[in-house]
């Protein structure tokens, strides 16, 4: 692992806003078509000027993803993409200077261990985690681990979410 890291994605978004621009955030499924190819694609996107990259971690039951991401997820899992590959990709991309977030279902984080995941992810320079299936009401353990490791946490909401839930 290297020591030079990209700033967090929130910093990059703030920098874009200060320029009067919208932040450009690219999405890549890690491990598709291969882990190294996804890393090369991420570096190319960084070189082309994206403000941040969101890496999608493949999950065996990607019910909240669309068909294209589902197909990429299946292909990545069939090729053996594992959580260590995610940390490798984040390490490579943050060392290349790009702020890197991860989108993952909650089950892989629990399987790895919440505190261990947060520490390992922060150790390779990750910015934060987007957890589409972890409601904020159930996120206390993740919030504590993320805060302890300086990670951003992003919950998703539906258009029908009441204002009190978004506060």
Kindly give the residue locations of the regions a language model identified.
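N-terminal amphipathic alpha-helix/helix-capping segment at the start of soluble metabolic enzymes
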Residues: 1-27, 90-92
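Active-site beta->alpha loop and helix N-cap motifs at the rims of alpha/beta catalytic domains
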Residues: 4-7, 41, 46, 52, ...
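N-terminal positively charged helical leader segments and presequences
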Residues: 10, 14-17, 35, 43-48
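N-terminal glycine-rich anion-binding loops that anchor highly charged ligand groups
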Residues: 16-23, 48-63
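Active-site mouth loops of central-metabolism enzymes
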Residues: 24-40, 100-113, 153-160
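Mobile beta-alpha loop/short-helix "lid" or hinge segments that flank ligand
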Residues: 59-62, 107, 140
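Catalytic beta/alpha-barrel core
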Residues: 77-81, 125-138, 151-162, 166-167
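Distinct, well-ordered alpha-helical segments
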Residues: 111-117, 140-145, 166
């Amino acid at each position: 692992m290297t020591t030079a890291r990209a700033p967090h994605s929130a910093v990059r978004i703030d920098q874009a806003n200060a320029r009067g621009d919208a932040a450009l955030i690219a999405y890549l499924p890690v491990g598709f078509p291969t882990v190294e190819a996804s890393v090369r694609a991420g570096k190319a996107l960084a070189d082309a000027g994206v403000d941040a990259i969101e890496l999608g971690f493949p999950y065996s039951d990607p019910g909240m993803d669309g068909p294209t991401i589902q197909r990429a997820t299946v292909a990545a899992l069939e090729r053996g993409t594992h959580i260590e590959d995610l940390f490798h990709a984040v390490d490579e991309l943050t060392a290349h200077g790009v702020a890197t977030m991860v989108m993952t279902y909650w089950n892989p984080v629990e399987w790895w261990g919440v505190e261990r995941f947060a520490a390992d992810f922060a150790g390779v320079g990750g910015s934060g985690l987007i957890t589409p299936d972890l409601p904020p009401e159930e996120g206390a353990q993740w919030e504590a681990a993320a805060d302890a490791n300086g990670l951003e946490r992003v919950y998703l909401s539906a258009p029908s979410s009441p204002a009190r839930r978004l506060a």
